[in-house]
Amino acid sequence: MVLRGRAVLLAVLLAAGSLGRWAQKPRGAPSAISAIQPKANFDAQQFAGTWLLAAVGSACHFLQEQGHRAEATALHVAPQGAAMAVSTFRKLDGICWQVSQRYGATGVPGRFLLPARGPRGAVHVVAAETDYHSFAVLYLERARQLSVKLYVRSLPVSDSVLGAFEQRVAQANLTQDQVLFFPTYGFCEAADQFHILDEVRR
């Protein structure tokens, strides 16, 4: 039961696009992610492979309070037609976990819908900027709360890529104090069969 509880916790953390509670916006506020354009002619085949999470910009209070507990996080991406199969690898209590999810197609290349647990609904995902071989900036929105994520193929992050990310963060009305940089070491490459959570089949 303890193992199962940890698995559920990890799924909730990943589905939220960050690590926890969000500051609430008025219900009447427009959806910020609807105005964000995906990369022109987004190519899921070129986007496939491994991405390392370098930084997250978010207004999540829990993220700011518990940022010192952030773990190195890697994404393994495989195209499934217009959709993408995404496996996230990160540690929880020192153990490597794999969470398998499906970024569902929406009819717009580069714009995806990720089913998620809980009453706050699905996560909207936009691959807004990428050169495919070095970096990618993804926006995630759930219950009208937006986060900006920077992924890279390898570390360290170049100054030009960091500058592009910081510009995106500013455009999302987030400050530098709301940016969390993730560890650059300790990445998980695999998880054993007892630490795999398949959200696709649920």
Curated annotation (Swiss-Prot):
Gene Ontology molecular function, alphabetical: complement binding; retinol binding
Subcellular location field: Secreted; Target cell membrane
Domain of life: Eukaryota
GO biological process, one term: complement activation, alternative pathway
Glycoprotein as UniProt keyword: yes
Protein name according to UniProt: Complement component C8 gamma chain
Function in brief: Component of the membrane attack complex (MAC), a multiprotein complex activated by the complement cascade, which inserts into a target cell membrane and forms a pore, leading to target cell membrane rupture and cell lysis. The MAC is initiated by proteolytic cleavage of C5 into complement C5b in response to the classical, alternative, lectin and GZMK complement pathways. The complement pathways consist in a cascade of proteins that leads to phagocytosis and breakdown of pathogens and signaling that strengthens the adaptive immune system.
Keyword Signal: yes
PANTHER family according to UniProt: COMPLEMENT COMPONENT C8 GAMMA CHAIN
Species in which this protein is naturally found: Oryctolagus cuniculus (Rabbit)
A family per Pfam: Lipocalin
Disulfide bonding pattern of the chain: 96-188
Keywords, comma-separated and alphabetical: Complement alternate pathway, Complement pathway, Cytolysis, Disulfide bond, Glycoprotein, Immunity, Innate immunity, Membrane, Membrane attack complex, Retinol-binding, Secreted, Signal, Target cell membrane, Target membrane
Modulation of this protein's activity: Membrane attack complex (MAC) assembly is inhibited by CD59, thereby protecting self-cells from damage during complement activation. MAC assembly is also inhibited by clusterin (CLU) chaperones that inhibit polymerization of C9.
Assembly notes: Heterotrimer of 3 chains: alpha (C8A), beta (C8B) and gamma (C8G); the alpha and gamma chains are disulfide bonded. Component of the membrane attack complex (MAC), composed of complement C5b, C6, C7, C8A, C8B, C8G and multiple copies of the pore-forming subunit C9.
Glycosylated residues in this chain: 173
Family in the record: Belongs to the calycin superfamily. Lipocalin family.
Listed GO CC annotations: blood microparticle; extracellular exosome; membrane attack complex
Residues in the signal sequence: 1-23
